Amino acid sequence: MTTLMVQGTTSDAGKSTLVTALCRWLTRQGVKVVPFKPQNMALNSAVTADGGEIGRAQAVQAQACFLQPHTDMNPVLLKPNSDTGAQVIIHGRAVTTMNAVAYHGYKEIAMQAVLESHRRLGESYPVIMVEGAGSPAEINLRANDIANMGFAEAVDCPVLLIADINRGGVFAHLVGTLELLSPSEQARVKGFIINRFRGDIALLQPGLDWLEARTGKPVVGVLPYVMDLHLEAEDGLDQRQTDKVEHVLNVVVPVLPRISNHTDFDPLRLHPQVNLQFIGPGQAIPPADLIILPGSKSVRSDLNYLRNSGWDTAIERHLRYGGKLMGICGGLQMLGEQVHDPLGLEGAAGSSAGFGLLAMSTVLEAEKQLRNVRGRLTLEDAEVSGYEIHAGVTTGPALEQAAVQLDDGRCDGAQSVDGQVLGTYLHGLFESPAACSALLRWAGLANVQSVDYHALRERDIERLADLVEKHLDGPLLRELCGLEAN
């Protein structure tokens, strides 16, 4: 078994995308490869085949390998629920919530989980493609590191260092990061990859020559800037819009302080007939055909934020003039009458009033519901698939008019009697073409075009593998993976 790790000079340098590309590139050559990220901090997560929870980036990387996501692919997941604290998920299950200082002392236990998962994957896969987190040169985080060089040292693996030239300062990033590493860590870095380059490569060549001479390490390749990739953002909210022939349906989503699984909206962002707007703090709330309340890692505090920002008044006005309102997961809970957190799972214990638009209440419980599900929307009987990740148990008469009839016999979500308000616990439902079309028609869009989001993502994974084939040093990459040259 061989392990190759990709680390970045910064967050968003391109680590997730490169690992996805390398996974598909190797898979196309018949190599049995598996993705791995020791520790991930993200609010976007996916449900695995073994009923756990991992970062969504690793789920996409699994798709690149034609594998089902598994908890061993991301053994430690941290989901922030305040500015200083996070829920700690080990092997797909939430085990505790702690602040950053407490977690620092917990890292030894977390590292055991990381190495256990790495060992298990190594028993089934000859190549493990690893993604680091943030930067390996964060001085304040280097002690007891499990996400970058601490892991690489523990399993004795080579490292590729990637940097984003589009931000500027790429040579300072690469050389500075390298020089902040220990001698043994520096020796692990086997080469550099420059990401998101625009322009004539000949103009960059003197810098590449200098970098190789300065460090004694090769530039494995320069990847071009790629427009319109349909891969899910690991954490940061992707507010890019694709070109629209015509803005037909206006959809507005509030950017909550603790928004989670905002990848739910990627299919809408890419839909040619949808104008999707994320509205952040201080921004005017525009007119809309559909308002969607997203998932939240801290429902009660985000409810308070919405009220303080005037969303309660805006929603009331929106409904009065015939607009449609939808809530997903935490957004569903907000639509009800009360949200109770007796255990203090998302902050101080207590209760908060919801918007009172659906006759139901939610109690947050310690045991999370984690499921991949299939079913049919009660709107148009449209097929839908998605996943549940929630600690809330919702009850009340509103649930008698369900939003989804699940194949396992359960019902999900609720609709208002007048048909203006709909809520569901299902993440990812817009990825189902039939369900997305039905919901857009419900929101008022006529002549809806069907968009296959899964096909778009698969196409772009192939595009990424093509870029690796064209722009990176294939023989060196195969050597680092313990493979013979083609």
From Swiss-Prot:
Family: Belongs to the CobB/CobQ family. CobQ subfamily.
CDD domains named in the record: CobQ_N (cd05389), GATase1_CobQ (cd01750)
One of the protein's GO biological processes: cobalamin biosynthetic process
Annotated keywords: Cobalamin biosynthesis, Glutamine amidotransferase
Record SUPFAM superfamilies: Class I glutamine amidotransferase-like, P-loop containing nucleoside triphosphate hydrolases
Gene this protein is translated from: cobQ
Active site: C329, H427
Segments forming domain GATase cobBQ-type: 248-435
Protein name: Cobyric acid synthase
